[in-house]
């Protein structure tokens, strides 16, 4: 295939993947936009940073972009805010831009306010999937909130909780009616609600439970009763979970692309920390069940994405969801998980290590703002800079001077010499000679006949002077040493130092500055998040916007009406005139505009 045709096909295929593109910020070294494509978002995003570093404002920027793109993509989102500031900022922004967002299906859930209630019956009848799966996920979510690693350590709670939920589901009731099923003294209502169950295990269990003495029943159910208390005691949660009419349906929310903004802050004292955590955990567990009921498409682009933003996620994400992050993309759930530092995950109960490992491995894109502590910085340095740190990087080189080679050359030698000498000699002498002469005959000396005497005197002087001069020239071979520098030793930069430098880069960052490495990137980049403008929205404008939004939702009702419906239903149960078996969800009267 021609390469141009191939890449043209690839570009066309990339455009067909549904979802929203996000602009994370500006790459500060180049000034270019750092973007996440819909395909990149499917592998999830992890954001962490200390308080005041820009993490929350970045999340707000991303949520705004998703809402602005709703008219084009129709992709929904769930935003869970444990502090309330993100919720307030988004409501103010949407109220200010109300005209352009009036067709976006906004679902605000605020645990701080008591005027309106979002009906959320977790025991609602499900059109798809096996209710046993939803019930089991509900049980696991409750166990997680109470710091239990699944239900293998609490088999009694698991069994009793399932028996309670099966009875409520088959009788088309709500979680509030669990208080009648756990009544230790009056078992009349309990017996009525547990008669004729089609689920064999639940029917068998209640047949045994209903013949227990009050003392034995209390011994069986006391622990389970304690775990249901947040649903039964906290008024805000009672009103939400106690509606058996039209309910928030996360399966429909995914299909319709609803934007659910949940403020689970404990500010105002309307809900406890335990209750807020339970609500958020149940919401996420229900979302996971709904996504699995929708199923996967045959191709990656067949499933419309649903975006999930969770700040301080370690308090709400169950191990079941965490360990299945790699599967979540197939079901269309694309998560953005945020917290202050990684070690928070490890400290989140018995399941912390499991959630930590799953998030670090499966959230393939990461943005890290300034944070502290070696125990937090080190794993992120490894994750962000892996493949960039060079173990062959030279830190120090030592050189020594050595004879590199010997060169043979010729050298001309010239010499000059001069010499001189002088000498002087004086001599004198005297010589006297005497002699006799005779004959020798027959061997005998005869008398001398001759005598001779002579003498001589002599003297003299001699002088000598010698001078000489000479020169010579000759060529002789010589050997010359060529000196040079030779590397004698090399010290490579140790991995510990490379990690330390990476940790320093993460630590030493200004506000709104972060280090990002998205899935598919070969190296991390320094980025600056965009400035998120604060809207000049007044409280009156925000309240008016919320009222219009609530009035359009068929499952939103005034809290007074919600309380009245619960009282009427419970009076019927107590009086014995319950029509629970024949109950069908009835939409509350709602102004639709």
Where are these regions (language model features)?
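Conserved H-loop
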Residues: 338-344
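Short beta-alpha connecting loops at secondary-structure transitions
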Residues: 122-124, 345, 363-367
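Conserved P-loop NTPase catalytic core
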Residues: 353-399
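Hydrophobic multi-pass inner-membrane translocation pores used for secretion
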Residues: 333-336, 461
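Extracytoplasmic/secreted cell-surface and envelope-processing proteins
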Residues: 87-89, 317-318, 345-347, 375-380
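P-loop NTPase motor domains
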Residues: 4, 8-10, 14-32, 38-53, ...
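Short regulatory helix/loop adjacent to the ATP-binding pocket of P-loop NTPases
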Residues: 90-94, 346-361
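Conserved P-loop NTPase motor module
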Residues: 1-14, 187-196, 219-223, 392-593
């Amino acid at each position: 295939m021609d390469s141009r045709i191939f890449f043209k096909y690839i570009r066309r295929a990339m455009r067909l993947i549904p979802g929203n593109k996000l602009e994370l910020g500006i790459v500060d070294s180049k000034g270019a936009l750092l973007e996440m494509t819909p395909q990149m978002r499917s592998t999830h995003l992890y954001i962490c940073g200390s308080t005041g570093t820009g993490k929350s404002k970045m999340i707000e920027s991303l949520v705004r972009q998703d809402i602005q793109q709703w008219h084009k993509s129709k992709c929904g989102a769930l935003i869970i805010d444990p502090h309330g500031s993100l919720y307030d900022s988004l409501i103010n922004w949407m109220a200010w831009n109300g005209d352009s967002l009036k067709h976006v299906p906004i679902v605000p859930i605020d645990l701080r306010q008591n005027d309106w209630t979002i009906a959320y019956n977790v025991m609602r009848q499900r059109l798809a999937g096996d209710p046993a799966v939803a019930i089991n996920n509900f049980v696991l979510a409750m166990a997680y909130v109470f710091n239990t690693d699944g239900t293998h350590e609490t088999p009694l709670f698991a069994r009793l909780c399932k028996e309670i939920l099966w009875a409520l589901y088959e009788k088309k009731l709500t979680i509030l009616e669990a208080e009648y099923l756990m009544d230790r003294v009056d078992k009349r209502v309990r017996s009525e609600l547990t008669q004729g169950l089609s689920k064999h295990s639940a029917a068998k269990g209640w047949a045994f439970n209903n013949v227990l003495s009050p003392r034995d029943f209390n011994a069986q159910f006391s622990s389970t009763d304690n775990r249901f208390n947040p649903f039964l005691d906290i008024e805000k949660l009672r009103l939400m979970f106690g509606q058996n009419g039209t309910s928030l349906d996360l399966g429909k929310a995914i299909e319709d692309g609803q934007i659910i903004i949940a403020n689970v802050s404990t500010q105002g004292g309307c809900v406890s920390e335990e209750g807020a955590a339970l609500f958020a955990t149940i919401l996420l567990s229900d979302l996971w069940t709904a996504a699995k009921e929708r199923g996967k498409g045959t191709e990656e682009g067949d499933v419309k994405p649903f975006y999930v933003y969770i700040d301080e996620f370690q308090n709400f994400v169950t191990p079941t969801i965490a360990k299945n992050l790699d599967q979540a993309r197939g079901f269309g759930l694309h998560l953005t998980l945020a917290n202050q530092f990684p070690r928070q995950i490890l400290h989140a109960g018995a399941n912390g290590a499991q959630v930590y490992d799953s998030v670090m491995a499966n959230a393939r894109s990461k943005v890290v703002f300034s944070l502290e502590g070696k125990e937090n910085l080190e794993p992120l340095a490894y994750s962000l800079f892996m493949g960039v740190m060079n173990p062959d990087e030279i830190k120090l080189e030592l050189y020594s001077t050595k004879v590199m080679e010997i060169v043979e050359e010729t050298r001309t030698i010239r010499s000059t010499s001069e010499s001189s000498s002088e000498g002087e000699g004086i001599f004198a002498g005297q010589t006297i000679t005497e002699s006799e002469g005779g004959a020798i005959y027959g061997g005998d000396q005869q008398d001398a006949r001759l005598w001779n005497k002579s003498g001589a005197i002599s003297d003299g002087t001699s002088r000598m002077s010698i001078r000489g001069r000479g020169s010579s020239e000759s060529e002789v071979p010589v050997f010359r040493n060529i000196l040079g520098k030779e590397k004698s030793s090399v010290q490579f930069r140790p991995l510990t130092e490379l990690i330390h430098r990476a940790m320093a880069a993460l630590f030493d960052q200004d506000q709104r500055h972060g280090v990002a490495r998205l899935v598919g990137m070969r190296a991390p980049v320094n980025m600056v998040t965009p400035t998120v403008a604060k809207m000049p929205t007044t409280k009156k404008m925000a309240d008016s916007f919320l009222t219009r939004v609530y009035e359009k939702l068929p499952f939103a009702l005034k809290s007074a009406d919600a309380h009245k419906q619960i009282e009427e239903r419970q009076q019927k149960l107590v009086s014995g005139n319950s029509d629970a078996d024949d109950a069908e969800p009835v939409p509350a009267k709602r102004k639709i505009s």
